[in-house]
């Protein structure tokens, strides 16, 4: 079982979903949140071919579908996540972002909270860029380095070493840490588990990420609003650009 299989199988279990009701509901509220995060409008993906790279259980795949996408290819490294995503998207499949070959056919490519779980993030960004057609949009979210101190060394340059401690904990102990974070910092159990559980959780400045976009030939680069999954302001770099 990978880090992410544990996350999607156990933390998406009935007990924890009940405690965090609504986080992964496929509803109009989810679509409205996605619109705010990306700057897309109603029918903003009408007739478009889209890719959700690292789709998890499919919350953003659903939003992309509702914004009019003609087709959404969704993939994830976790078989447990794909089981969930397939309920809404028959095109969901198991794959690894590191295995992507250049394939610039997509009008919209999303990589939400995925790149920073790879040791060679810049190389993975290039792989994501290679999927976007001319005039298409790439939207990514990675962790913001400025707020690493809120994550008890589980995020940023210390994450790999800190993960060795995490692996020694029981699942119940891990959940307890997340519950305490919810009490002191806000957010939800899944959001904190998602931050603490992966072996690699690197972080970057908005300036670094913007430079990646420029180097890969994107313009109209925009830093968007933060996510609402945890309460720490701007704890994520949420950015998109248009392939020129």
Whereabouts are the PLM-identified features?
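A short SAM/SAH-binding and catalytic strip from SAM-dependent methyltransferases
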Residues: 108-119
């Amino acid at each position: 079982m990978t880090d992410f299989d544990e996350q999607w199988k156990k933390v998406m279990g009935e007990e924890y979903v009940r405690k965090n009701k609504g986080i992964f509901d496929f509803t109009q509220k989810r679509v409205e949140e996605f619109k705010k995060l990306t700057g897309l409008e109603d029918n903003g993906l009408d007739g478009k071919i889209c890719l959700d790279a690292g789709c998890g259980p499919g919350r953003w795949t659903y939003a992309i579908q509702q914004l009019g996408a003609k087709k959404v290819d969704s993939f994830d490294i976790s078989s447990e996540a794909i089981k969930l995503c397939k309920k809404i998207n028959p095109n969901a499949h198991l794959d690894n972002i590191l295995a992507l070959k250049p394939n610039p056919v997509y009008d919209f490519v999303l990589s939400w909270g995925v790149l920073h779980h790879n040791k060679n993030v810049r190389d993975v960004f290039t792989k994501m860029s290679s999927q976007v057609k001319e005039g298409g949009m790439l939207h990514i979210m990675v962790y913001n380095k400025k707020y690493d101190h809120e994550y008890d060394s589980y995020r940023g340059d210390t994450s790999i070493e800190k993960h060795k401690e995490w692996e020694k904990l029981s699942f119940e102990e891990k959940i307890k840490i997340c519950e305490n974070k919810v009490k002191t910092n806000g957010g939800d159990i899944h959001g904190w588990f998602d931050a603490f559980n992966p072996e690699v959780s690197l972080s970057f400045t908005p300036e670094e990420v913007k430079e990646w976009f420029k180097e890969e030939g994107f313009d109209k680069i925009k830093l968007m609003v933060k996510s609402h999954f945890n309460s720490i302001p701007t704890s994520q770099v949420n950015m998109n650009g248009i392939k020129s």
